[in-house]
Regions:
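A short catalytic or substrate-binding loop motif that flags glycine-/basic-rich loops and adjacent residues
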Residues: 113-114, 158-163, 171-172, 186-187
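Short glycine/serine/proline-enriched coil/turn segments at secondary-structure junctions
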Residues: 77-79, 185-188
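Ligand-binding pocket scaffold of soluble enzyme catalytic domains
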Residues: 6-7, 29, 35-36, 70-73, ...
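Predominantly a Rossmann-like dinucleotide-binding segment in NAD(P)-dependent oxidoreductases
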Residues: 38, 45-159, 274
């Protein structure tokens, strides 16, 4: 779908995991570069409140130099396996549904981006550093094989995905990232999100905590705190002060509107940022190279584990440009540009509503939808003819109101 979009002149935004193997990663990179169109990975966890505040702290030096990070997707899915899509073409004779079938047939971290995306941003991956080496190790499939046996009555001789997979990556600057994947064993939901720095430490699960060295806050924008050391976490008052200071401007702008929507508002913030950057012609928060880097763990991990957990060279998806930009940042328009764009968006929306009413598109759509037999073809053509005039009608209304 993403390839079709770019081949037809449209930017693409893909749900995770956006690419299932290295070939797909390179295909999307090649096409994005060829068409000069964006290919955005819809990684909503990069917009979580704790992750974004920790990113600001890391950028301000609160943790010193971040030298190690951990992320994960630990989410027991036993209640959900049978609700995933089932192939209607009878390619799933054991009724496993796509996700369990994919886990059974593939090794490696198959859902790495929730854990990897936020920590990769904190470690400036592709903005001054990159992954160079990967090693992966997994457990045997115990719970996976048992689920297949229980639900199909058959022994699963070959279940590729281990119940728990651990992937270690070393960067060009000598830092390390650990990513875990476990969708099989019973335990609380956990994305880990841990940052280890030369002056501090952040951890999100099971509770959001920070440990800061006594001199870590000197020279930063953090509020002054007395009697702190890294042997214990900040107390509730200190943590609150730190979190208040590093409220992310993106969340300040969008989070409240989306708080009651998908995943606590992360989806809304992510979609809003995508639209914002496209409207203003700004670099997206995550690009096609990030997408490839984060999605490559599946096949690279499988190669490592199929070769006795050997070290594997990580591809340079940027083709040598990973060190051109120094430090991860979000792009922003000026307040004047934002106001101008908001005014145009409001005017366009009003014009669109007016045009739809003038062309009677909803009435024609309902008529086509409800028509039967020979009348359906005529009703559909009538709707399509009117719909084809929508853009020109909108432009006409906008010109009149200028």
């Amino acid at each position: 779908v993403a390839k079709c979009a770019m081949e037809n002149g449209k930017h693409a935004a893909i749900e995770v995991p956006s690419a299932m193997n290295l070939e797909q990663c390179w295909n999307l990179i090649d096409l994005s570069e060829k068409t000069r169109l964006h290919c955005f990975i819809l990684e909503n966890c990069c917009y979580d409140d704790y992750e974004m505040k920790s990113l600001l702290m890391a950028q301000d030096g609160v943790f010193g130099e971040v030298i190690r990070a951990e992320g994960a997707y630990i989410h027991e899915l036993s209640e959900f396996w049978k609700y995933y899509w089932k192939d209607p073409n009878d390619n799933d004779k054991d009724n496993l549904h796509w996700r369990m079938k994919y886990n059974m047939e593939n090794r490696g971290d198959l859902y790495a981006t929730h854990g990897l995306g936020p920590v990769a941003q904190c470690m400036d991956i592709h903005r001054g550093d990159r992954f160079t080496t990967l090693i992966a190790m997994d457990t045997e499939s115990f719970a996976g094989k048992e689920w297949v046996k229980k639900n199909t009555g058959k022994e699963s001789e070959e279940f590729r995905n281990g119940d728990h997979t651990t992937t270690l990556m070393r960067t060009a600057k000598g830092k390390v990232v650990e990513i875990q994947h476990n969708v099989m064993t019973p335990q609380p939901y956990n994305r880990l999100f841990k940052l280890t720095g030369t002056k501090g430490y952040a951890t999100k699960y099971p509770t959001e905590e920070f440990a800061i060295a006594g001199d870590a806050l000197t020279g930063t924008d953090a509020p002054k705190m007395d009697n702190i050391n890294a042997h214990g976490f900040l107390n509730a008052e200190q943590k609150k002060a730190l979190m208040e200071k590093y409220r992310h401007p993106i969340l300040e702008k969008y989070a409240e509107k989306g708080r009651h929507l998908g995943h606590g508002g992360m989806d809304y913030v992510m979609d809003s940022r995508l639209v914002y950057c496209l409207q203003h012609g700004l670099p997206l928060d995550m690009d096609v190279y990030d997408m490839a880097e984060w999605c490559a763990l599946g096949e690279l991990g499988a190669i490592s584990m199929d070769n006795n957990c050997a070290a594997v060279t990580f591809p340079d998806f940027t083709r040598g440009y990973w060190n051109e930009v120094k430090g991860y940042t979000h792009a922003y328009a000026t307040p004047a540009q934002e106001a101008e764009q908001e005014a145009y968006a409001d005017a366009y929306t009003a014009a669109q509503k007016e045009a739809v009413a003038k062309l009677k598109l909803w009435e024609l759509y309902d008529a086509a939808k409800n028509a039967e037999g020979k009348t359906k073809t005529g009703a559909t053509k009538k709707y399509e003819k009117a719909a084809a005039r929508l853009d020109s009608q909108i432009e006409k209304i906008l010109k009149v109101k200028k």
